[in-house]
Amino acid sequence: MKKYEYLIVGAGLFGSIFAHEATKRGKKCLVIEKRDHIGGNCYTQNIEDINVHKYGAHIFHTSNKVVWDYIQQFAEFNRFTNSPVARYKDELYSLPFNMLTFNKMWGVITPQEAEAKIKEQISKENITEPKNLEEQAISLVGRDIYEKLIKGYTEKQWGRECTELPAFIIKRLPVRYTYDNNYFYDTYQGIPIGGYTGIFERMLEGIEVKLNIDFFAEREYYESLAEKIVFTGMIDEYFGYQFGKLEYRSLRFDNDVLDVPNYQGNAVVNYTEAKVPYTRIIEHKHFEYGTQAKTVITREYSKEYEEGDEPYYPINDQRNNELYTKYKELADNQTNVIFGGRLGE
């Protein structure tokens, strides 16, 4: 008989919740994590008494009451509403695209005026079968919004021209003919008071966790310890890249502590101009309505994934989707491995 019933590779949301629930049911679990902390990409680090989202902004939102009630047992949430702002040159626009955006863009006041303006721009281009992301976006919202708020940001995000990206990446663009600038439609939304890390500490209380462990460096040993494995890493890496490597994008974060109480007046400002190298600036104190004397900002840069980088999201194109399907078929045939999480499924 093996020492553990479950070996859980990765202490992010999927791995931590699995470990918590399995332990509640009397199963013996070992959680291993390659980083020096739990929490995955939701990890928050306290800097200058501000909870800094180390791996980019994470706003908890759901319309599922069961999920909302479940997460409440680990933290109290505030009422934060995600209302990002887009900066193009010296202009600021409300996101998602709504009447505030259209008023700033064209000076229109009523929903009818805004709808007519967008329809006019779409019909002017006469795109019936979009061949790429650029044509798809223009066919949905017109050229003005595309040029100012979509093009530069998207090209930085993917590292490719919009004319080289497939149309299916954008199936729809949310357009609201109201003055509601709440980014999410979900019923429940907020930020855990005190940061996300406490959630994981409470989830993993009493469970054996080992940090700074590379599963692949000692794979045979760790696989021998448990009856079943829960794997939350890169699915292609698990299978030894036997069909080839999936392509990912990575991110770089540059933090600055500033001796001012308020830098940009909003938690998230997207920079949509191509010549600005970063995609957005996060000012973390605004997630929890902070009043500290200083502030912490993070500039977020999108970059090509290189070995040793953290993979954040897979490149969504035909080649990668076909490759993923092959790995998914392999995963589905594993009887003693559960794949989950952002990269595992």
Q: Where are the model-predicted features located?
A:
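Beta1/beta-strand and adjacent pyrophosphate-binding region of the FAD-binding site
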Residues: K2-F14, L30
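Glycine-rich FAD pyrophosphate-binding loop
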Residues: H20-E48
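Dinucleotide-binding Rossmann-like beta1-alpha1 core, especially the glycine-rich loop
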Residues: E48-S123
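Short loop/edge segments at beta-strand edges and connector loops
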Residues: G10, T81, V209-F215, G341
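Short, well-ordered alpha-helix to beta-strand connector turns
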Residues: Y4, G26, I207, L225-E227, ...
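Active-site/ligand-binding neighborhood in enzyme catalytic cores
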Residues: K89-P96, L100-K228, T232, F239
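Mid-domain catalytic core of redox enzymes
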Residues: R25, F215-K326, L330
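Short FAD-binding loop at a beta-strand-to-alpha-helix junction that anchors the flavin cofactor
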Residues: A331-E345
